[in-house]
Curated annotation (Swiss-Prot):
Keywords: ATP-binding, Cytoplasm, Kinase, Magnesium, Metal-binding, Nucleotide metabolism, Nucleotide-binding, Phosphoprotein, Transferase. InterPro entries: NDK-like_dom, NDK-like_dom_sf, Nucleoside_diP_kinase, Nucleoside_diP_kinase_AS. It holds the Pfam family NDK. Major role in the synthesis of nucleoside triphosphates other than ATP. The ATP gamma phosphate is transferred to the NDP beta phosphate via a ping-pong mechanism, using a phosphorylated active-site intermediate. CDD domains: NDPk_I (cd04413). Its cofactor is Mg(2+). It is an enzyme of class 2 (transferase). It catalyses: a 2'-deoxyribonucleoside 5'-diphosphate + ATP = a 2'-deoxyribonucleoside 5'-triphosphate + ADP; a ribonucleoside 5'-diphosphate + ATP = a ribonucleoside 5'-triphosphate + ADP. This is Nucleoside diphosphate kinase. The active site is at H117. GO terms for cellular component: cytoplasm. One of its GO terms (molecular function) is metal ion binding. One of its GO terms (biological process) is CTP biosynthetic process. It comes from Bartonella bacilliformis (strain ATCC 35685 / KC583 / Herrer 020/F12,63).
């Protein structure tokens, strides 16, 4: 089993409801370690840059508005198969389809306000981590 790093974000719908600790505990309970974390309020420009891959999608404008509407918590997680573990504990994008006990089943309000984001591949993880963290901010 490979030790990996992945990117995780707790979105504004969850931070508004003071769920940062509960969600982080769910992540840590899978064996993942938080090796970097900070609370940020994304500017519109930061949200557009972070979600640039979705620029041509019909939901892009709504996504940017939502992500810049309140604080988020950005984190780097580390552990065995961290990307897969993080995605499993997050649950399906649509909370209606998420398995019981996953973050989205427990905490998400809707498909748009689904509480968390996580990298889907090693390449994406590397890019997303570098977007928010310098090497000196990641302390394993």
């Amino acid at each position: 089993m490979a030790i990996e790093r992945t990117f995780s974000m707790i979105k504004p719908d969850a931070t508004r409801r003071n769920l940062t600790g509960a969600i982080t505990k769910m992540l840590e309970d899978t064996g993942l370690r938080v090796i970097a974390s900070k609370r940020v309020w994304m500017s519109r420009r930061e949200a557009e840059g972070f979600y640039a891959v979705h620029r041509e999608r019909p939901f892009f404008e709504e996504l940017v508005e939502f992500m810049s509407s309140g604080p988020t918590v950005v984190q780097v997680l580390e552990g065995e198969n961290a990307i897969m573990k993080n995605r499993e504990v997050m649950g399906a994008t649509n909370p209606a389809d998420a398995e019981m006990g996953t973050i989205r089943k427990v905490h998400a309000l809707s498909i748009g306000e689904n509480s968390v984001h996580g990298s889907d591949s090693p390449e994406t993880a590397k890019t997303e981590i570098a977007y928010w963290f310098s090497d000196t901010e990641i302390v394993g």
